[in-house]
Amino acid sequence: LDVKIRYIKKWIDQRRLAAEMYNHYLAEISEISLPKVHKNTFHSYHLYVVEALHRDKLATYLNDINIATGIHYPKPLPALDCYKSHKLDLAEFPRAVSSAKSILSLPMFPEITEDQIRHVSSKIKAHYSK
């Protein structure tokens, strides 16, 4: 870790630049909601997570053409076993429930290129243009 920590600022800067490129190329796809960054916050973009209409179909399509995606948060927090004792009603968390059904992580790593981001974005656009 000592070796890697020297590169953390550079890697975060590269991820932030990649996120800007994704935001640019995906901006006009109405079926995709981009990550929101709130005022006075700093996003490291460890993941680049969008909300996608018909997420599972999009994920399957992208995976079938060798574009790796991920669903990093498949359950809303109140549905996790560690919260069972709290007897939480999922109906009280509609945004968490809907997000868990629509979020999709797109390829993100410090060395991702603009060409790769453009390729991923064009395939997403093609999927929704069918």
Label the predicted regions.
Residues 1-130:
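PLP-dependent aminotransferase class I/II
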